A protein has these predicted regions:
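SEC14/CRAL-TRIO lipid-binding/transfer domains and related phosphoinositide-recognition modules
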Residues: 1-96, 100-128
Length: 128
């Protein structure tokens, strides 16, 4: 499998949704390819927005642990920085974020933080 195929196994398009597979992410990702994956995410997002006004994100967190959160913090920061840099208003065009198989910690943190969030943001997050 080449690098493009590997990256496409982490994140793919399904209609107007970006589907993120953490199980594949953790087996493939390395700091050397963070920007390749981030570029793919934004390319796929652009593809969706060519035919849809909004997009959704589905994240399958099966197997995520606190160690994993700490290990991939650099990727999350790089993704956030690039999103702010590109100025394409992706957050305004985001419909819903569905979190599938949330680990215990995510579900519990979500229960604490969701009541404190702005209603417009809170309505976009679905813990399932």
């Amino acid at each position: 499998m080449n690098k493009t195929d590997l990256l496409n196994s982490i994140i793919r398009i399904d209609e107007n949704r970006l589907l993120f597979n953490y199980t594949m992410f953790k087996t493939i990702i390395h700091p050397d390819i963070y920007m390749d994956l981030i570029q793919l995410i934004f390319q796929q997002n652009d593809t969706i927005l060519q035919t849809n006004a909004m997009y959704d994100v589905v994240v399958d967190f099966k197997g995520l642990t606190m160690t994993g959160v700490e290990r991939y913090k650099g990727f999350i920061i790089a993704l956030s920085d690039e999103g702010q840099r590109n100025g394409k208003n992706f957050l305004q065009k985001l419909g819903k974020i569905t979190i599938v198989n949330p680990p215990f910690m995510v579900a519990n943190v979500g229960k604490i933080l969701l009541p404190l969030m702005d209603k417009s943001v809170k309505e976009k997050i679905i813990l399932g």
